Amino acid sequence: MTIALGKVDEKRGWFDNVDDWLKRDRFVFVGWSGILLFPCAYFALGGWLTGTTFVSSWYTHGLASSYLEGCNFLTSAVSTPSNSMAHSLLLLWGPEAQGDFTRWCQLGGLWTFVALHGAFGLIGFMLRQFEIARAVQIRPYNAIAFSAPIAVFVSVFLIYPLGQSGWFFAPSFGVAGIFRFILFFQGFHNWTLNPFHMMGVAGVLGAALLCAIHGATVENTLFEDGDGSNTFRAFNPTQAEETYSMVTANRFWSQIFGVAFSNKRWLHFFMLFVPVTGLWMSALGVVGLALNLRAYDFVSQEIRAAEDPEFETFYTKNILLNEGIRAWMAAQDQPHENLVFPEEVLPRGNAL
């Protein structure tokens, strides 16, 4: 009697074949995440380039916004739909455009197209980092870190306008359009006095400081592996052994501050933690603004400033500035409201 030992070949289905093709070793890895990433990134970028080049915002904001109309890179934009569109997805085949591409562009359909494809493209890029990290068997902290800018994008471009009356109040996709949105945030929400914004600023600027300090310290403590060594010579950038002296760096900062990071793991975790936490906090703050939650309101100072013309603080001055932003910005920025402000209600300094 003969006994045959071996593994029975399982029948491979279409899913296995697709999985093999997606994960094949090639110059640009595709993967399952690529099914989401590449089309969405292509459409988001293509929609933005199309809008900034050819499409006017005259019907939504009363503005010229394309290169074709004379705008430059800083002033062109893909503008948000008008407030009358509310939160409509503005699908090309929807009841608003009814398949008319020109009408769809006039209504602001490119903005929802770019915003939604952009959001899913960013999510696809994060999933790509997860997928490749799993394939090469490393931890997924790159993907976790990238969740921070995704949180900011989604909160600013999607959640905030969803909390307001329509997509109109989201930022337009353009440099000057983003600046307009920042002024709007300050005037209508006093955003710079919001503690979540403060944490975001601390995270971003703190991360820049940490990055500069870390880079400088590594360059300062590179091992000299040959004659005439400097930052760019006498060591191999692909060498397997240690490139710089952590002990020397630790001694240096111990003398500077009295404390220093004791190991590279804690040092690099801190460099990851600071910016990611800051961006996540600012995203949470924007979610609060979507619900019109207030920041710090020092009402007692406002009451005293109203009663005493000689009493003024930097806070009361900022409140006046915010009132000015609202009064002068709203009439132009929200033409659909037909706002008209008589001279006597426009804000003036306490001493005037």
UniProtKB/Swiss-Prot annotation:
Cellular compartment(s): Plastid, Chloroplast thylakoid membrane
NCBIfam families, sorted: psbD
Organism classification: Eukaryota, Viridiplantae, Chlorophyta, Mamiellophyceae, Mamiellales
Function according to Swiss-Prot or TrEMBL: Photosystem II (PSII) is a light-driven water:plastoquinone oxidoreductase that uses light energy to abstract electrons from H(2)O, generating O(2) and a proton gradient subsequently used for ATP formation. It consists of a core antenna complex that captures photons, and an electron transfer chain that converts photonic excitation into a charge separation. The D1/D2 (PsbA/PsbD) reaction center heterodimer binds P680, the primary electron donor of PSII as well as several subsequent electron acceptors. D2 is needed for assembly of a stable PSII complex.
Note on how the cofactor is bound: The D1/D2 heterodimer binds P680, chlorophylls that are the primary electron donor of PSII, and subsequent electron acceptors. It shares a non-heme iron and each subunit binds pheophytin, quinone, additional chlorophylls, carotenoids and lipids. There is also a Cl(-1) ion associated with D1 and D2, which is required for oxygen evolution. The PSII complex binds additional chlorophylls, carotenoids and specific lipids.
Xref: Gene3D superfamilies: Photosystem II protein D1-like
Top-level taxon in the UniProt lineage: Eukaryota
Residues where chlorophyll a PD2 binds: 197
Entry-linked Pfam families: Photo_RC
Gene name tied to this protein: psbD
Gene Ontology MF annotations: chlorophyll binding; electron transporter, transferring electrons within the cyclic electron transport pathway of photosynthesis activity; iron ion binding; oxygen evolving activity
Membrane topology: Multi-pass membrane protein
Subunit and interaction comment: PSII is composed of 1 copy each of membrane proteins PsbA, PsbB, PsbC, PsbD, PsbE, PsbF, PsbH, PsbI, PsbJ, PsbK, PsbL, PsbM, PsbT, PsbX, PsbY, PsbZ, Psb30/Ycf12, at least 3 peripheral proteins of the oxygen-evolving complex and a large number of cofactors. It forms dimeric complexes.
Entry keyword annotation includes Lyase: no
Its EC number(s): 1.10.3.9
Keywords for the protein's UniProt record, in alphabetical order: Acetylation, Chlorophyll, Chloroplast, Chromophore, Electron transport, Iron, Magnesium, Membrane, Metal-binding, Oxidoreductase, Phosphoprotein, Photosynthesis, Photosystem II, Plastid, Thylakoid, Transmembrane, Transmembrane helix, Transport
Naturally occurring in which organism (per UniProt): Ostreococcus tauri
Designated name of the protein: Photosystem II D2 protein
Catalytic activity: 2 a plastoquinone + 4 hnu + 2 H2O = 2 a plastoquinol + O2
Enzyme class: oxidoreductase
Binding site for a plastoquinone: 214, 261
Family of the protein in this entry: Belongs to the reaction center PufL/M/PsbA/D family.
Residues that coordinate or bind chlorophyll a ChlzD2: 117
GO biological process, one term: photosynthetic electron transport in photosystem II
Residues that bind pheophytin a: 129, 142
Family annotation (CDD domains): Photosystem-II_D2
Residues modified as Phosphothreonine: 2
Listed PANTHER family: PHOTOSYSTEM II D2 PROTEIN, PHOTOSYSTEM II PROTEIN D1
PTM sites of type N-acetylthreonine: 2
